[in-house]
């Protein structure tokens, strides 16, 4: 079973350039042919690409050093050596590549069509054919190939989810994501069941529109400072378009809980408070009283748009999804349902008018 690993350091070595050749022509009736040593091949590059089937960096725990193939040496008849084969490393979409020595962000994978050449292979050495001069007709030396680039990298994964579910421990985040997506997180009736983010895909409008949703481990006061499971997973909601603040509807003070959660997000990254959000009251099946549910909603409605659900009993889940469509994805869905035709205006330029 995969373990969720979202940060790891690795070393990569591009391929060494191939050596130039020391070689001389062998011609009939020519005792000493001229130099014809070919150049060495370029070393292979180290290339990083995203893989949509990967959700963790755990494969890089067992192996931390990676080296591309060296370029092949040159040969006679001025033939260059073959280029070394590139080494391709795959990472989950959302992975950021940092230079571990400088801390600089080198690349951010936000599209599955991207590719990043992180280390380039060394140039091949020149063969002895390059070194023939009027005073040295038979050079017996060639250049060695150059070293390939070396990089010490930190791979840091930030999930590319459209919606993030944020809540206290045991609010029902994993149950909710299991009901509205095809994800199958571990679910239990105790705090901190979720020890790593879960990612699922929500299909809407007959599957013409999809979005991804992630739940992160429960947040407690001080999470942004490392308390509880800490800030290690907060970065996975940095890219979301919208946030669901999920609460156990029987909480004694939902307003204070919301204030605490938003304070933790703000301490970690103030930009998160600018994301649109919904307040979701879960577990309303506990009392099974519609009027009481209305009273609970009324008490917190001044905090934002509120939806009351029971994830476990699948109550009001469609209402929740409709609100998510409206609050988070209204423009995107409208563009899909009502595409604008690309029409060109009729030209009234006199030059376009011809007499028959």
UniProtKB/Swiss-Prot annotation:
Family note: Belongs to the TRAFAC class OBG-HflX-like GTPase superfamily. OBG GTPase family.
One GO process term, biological-process aspect: ribosome biogenesis
Annotated residues for binding of GTP: 167-174, 192-196, 215-218, 282-285, 310-312
Name assigned to this protein: GTPase Obg
Transmembrane segments: none
Cofactor: Mg(2+)
Obg domain segment(s): 2-160
């Amino acid at each position: 079973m995969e373990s969720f690993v979202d940060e790891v350091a690795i070393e990569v070595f591009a391929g060494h350039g191939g050596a130039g050749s020391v070689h001389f022509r062998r011609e009939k009736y020519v005792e000493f042919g001229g130099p014809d040593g070919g150049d060495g091949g370029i070393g292979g590059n180290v290339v990083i690409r995203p893989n949509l089937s990967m959700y963790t960096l755990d494969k890089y725990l067992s192996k931390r050093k990676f080296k591309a193939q060296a370029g092949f040496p040159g040969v006679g008849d001025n033939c260059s050596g073959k280029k070394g084969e590139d080494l391709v490393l795959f990472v989950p979409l959302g992975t950021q590549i940092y230079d571990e020595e400088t801390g600089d962000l080198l690349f951010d994978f936000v599209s599955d069509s991207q590719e990043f050449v992180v280390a380039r292979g060394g140039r091949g050495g020149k063969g002895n054919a390059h070194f023939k001069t009027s005073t040295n007709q038979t050079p017996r030396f060639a250049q060695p190939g150059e070293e390939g680039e070396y990089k010490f990298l930190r791979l840091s994964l930030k999930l590319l989810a459209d919606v993030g579910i944020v809540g206290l421990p045991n609010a029902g985040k994993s149950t909710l994501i299991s009901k509205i997506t095809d994800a199958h997180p571990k679910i239990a009736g105790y705090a901190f069941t979720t020890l790593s983010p879960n990612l699922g895909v929500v299909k809407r409008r007959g599957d013409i529109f999809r979005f991804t949703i992630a739940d992160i481990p429960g947040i407690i006061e001080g999470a942004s400072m490392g308390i509880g499971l800490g800030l290690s997973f907060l970065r996975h909601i940095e890219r979301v378009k919208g946030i669901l603040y999920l609460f156990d509807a029987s909480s004694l003070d939902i307003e204070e809980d919301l204030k605490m959660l938003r304070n933790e997000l703000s301490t970690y990254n103030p930009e998160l408070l600018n994301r649109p959000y919904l307040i979701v009251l879960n577990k309303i099946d506990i009392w099974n009283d519609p009027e009481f549910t209305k009273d609970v909603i009324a008490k917190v409605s001044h905090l934002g748009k509120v939806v009351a659900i029971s994830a476990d009993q699948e109550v009001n889940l469609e209402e929740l999804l409709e609100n998510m469509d409206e609050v988070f994805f209204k423009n995107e869905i409208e563009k899909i349902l009502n595409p604008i035709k690309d029409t060109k205006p009729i030209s009234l330029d006199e030059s376009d008018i011809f007499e028959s």
